[in-house]
Curated annotation (Swiss-Prot):
GO terms for molecular function: DNA binding. Residues 25-37, 43-54, 78-90 have a biased composition (Basic and acidic residues). It is found in: Nucleus. Coiled coil: none annotated. SMART domains: ARID (SM01014), BRIGHT (SM00501). Residues 1-120, 237-274 are annotated as: Disordered. This is AT-rich interactive domain-containing protein 5. Residues 336-434 form the sHSP domain. Pfam families: ARID. Its main location: nucleus.
């Protein structure tokens, strides 16, 4: 039988009332019989709840405790100490119920297991690694979609922002899929600058009737997820590598494309002006008007004839300035006779006008090049206009034609000039015979 160990004195706080009872002789006898002897002296120091949370103080009523656990105490294999629960002492001297089992955790320790920092970031960003992207659907499981929506709702609520889950054609939109698709491409700024919203929207397989895919999904993201993205990026929880360089490259690409298209447009305009100037010089020498050709684009044949008449009148008005002459000349427009030789070509329009020194012929031969139109004249006052397309099976339905214009007076064929300009416009100046 082991000798009694002397109890060590401990400082008891002044505000604590209570007495720790000394074990009885019967309890000492039972302890000495049930547990084996240990070469290390047993530590029977009594402690209070205010000093140490984990204690080895003996239980006041050891007999009842042994009966509850089957008459056996757990023995520590290293030093033979008995694992017993602490006895709580109340401020009024009474004792609370003593329980056996594991000791309470230290104050300040979390009750839940520690979560690694990497998993916390992944939970907040909801992104998939490369390995997960090959195995897991980007749309996410239904429980993941619901958890993501709750996370975004909580964020908006904390920041006093209005949030309403978007719906696409009456069905709730998968915001988790939209979030992963945009962040995977580099974030909102990159997707907007690079004009990738249609690519994002097409991944949702919109119906054919949806003609505003880019605008629709951009608005969805701006209203539901843009502030959430900004928050994560500002706090460093969301890192988008290459997001700073992509917009600049996209802007440079866009600027270069605009510059290239602008330069091409400039070249085309310059070429049109140069050709127009060339025709104007040629036509001024032969008597044709200098009205820009582009203005007549897209008009039907009848307005073209009227415009041609008006153009000629204006030109004559600038040269002579006599209104009486115009009215007299307008009466002479029907003096010339136009006859079809062979199959009639109604799509060829010819208008003849007589001035004080010549006949002016305005003709429309659309679809024919300069090499495909021939003009012949003789002193008797006859002019032949013939067209021969190189490809007879052309898609425009142009067929060979020949028209003869009979003038009421003799003409000078040596000084007759003809010019074919753009869009199949033919102008012929036929001077009177001197």
């Amino acid at each position: 039988m082991m000798a009694d160990t002397e109890m060590q004195e401990q400082d008891v706080p002044s505000g604590t009332k209570g007495v720790v009872e000394e074990p009885s002789e019967l309890e000492k006898d039972l302890n000495s019989i049930e547990r084996p002897k240990s070469p290390v002296p047993e530590d029977t120091t009594h402690t209070l709840d205010s000093d140490v949370h984990l204690s080895d103080a003996p239980i006041a009523n050891q007999i009842e405790a042994n009966e509850e656990v089957g008459g056996q105490n757990s023995v520590d294999g290293r030093n033979g100490d008995v694992d017993q629960s602490e006895k709580k002492i109340t401020s009024d001297g009474g004792q609370e119920e003593t329980t056996l089992g594991e000791s309470n955790p230290l104050k300040g320790d979390p009750s839940s297991p520690h979560v690694p920092e990497e998993s916390v970031k992944k939970w907040k960003t909801w992104l998939l690694s490369d390995a997960e992207a090959r195995e897991v659907d980007e749309a996410g499981a239904p429980q993941d979609q619901e958890a993501f929506i709750k996370e975004v709702e909580a964020f908006n609520k904390e920041n006093f922002l209005e949030f309403k889950a978007p719906k696409f054609y009456g069905q709730p939109l998968n915001c988790l899929k939209l979030w992963r698709a945009v962040i995977k491409l580099g974030g909102y700024d990159v997707v907007t600058t690079s004009k990738l919203w249609r690519q994002v929207g097409e991944s949702f397989h919109p119906p054919k009737t949806c003609t505003t895919v880019s605008w629709t999904f951009r608005i969805f993201y701006e209203k539901a997820l843009l502030e959430y993205e900004k928050h994560l990026r500002q706090n460093g929880e969301l890192n988008l590598p290459g997001s700073a360089s992509l917009p600049s490259s996209g802007i440079e690409k866009e600027a270069s494309s605009h510059q290239a298209s602008g330069s091409g447009r400039t070249r085309r305009d310059a070429a049109a002006r140069a050709m127009q100037g060339w025709h104007s010089q040629r036509l001024l020498g032969s008597g044709e008007v200098t009205e820009p050709i582009v203005k007549e684009k897209g008009l039907n044949s009848t307005p073209k004839q009227k415009n041609l008449k008006n153009i000629g009148v204006q030109k004559q008005k600038t040269t002579t300035g006599m209104d009486l002459v115009f009215s007299h000349e307008s009466e002479k427009q029907s003096t010339a006779e136009v006859i079809d030789v062979g199959p009639p070509a109604d799509w060829v329009k010819i208008n003849v006008r007589e001035t004080k020194d010549c006949f002016e012929i305005f003709a429309l031969v659309p679809g024919l090049l300069r090499e495909e139109v021939r003009v012949q004249s003789d002193p008797a006052g006859r002019l032949v206009i013939a067209g021969q397309p190189e490809q007879l099976d052309n898609p425009w339905g142009i067929t060979p034609f020949k028209k003869v214009v009979n003038f009421p007076a003799r003409i000078d064929p040596l000084h007759t000039s003809a010019v074919v300009s753009l869009h199949g416009r033919l102008f012929v100046r036929v001077p009177f015979e001197q």
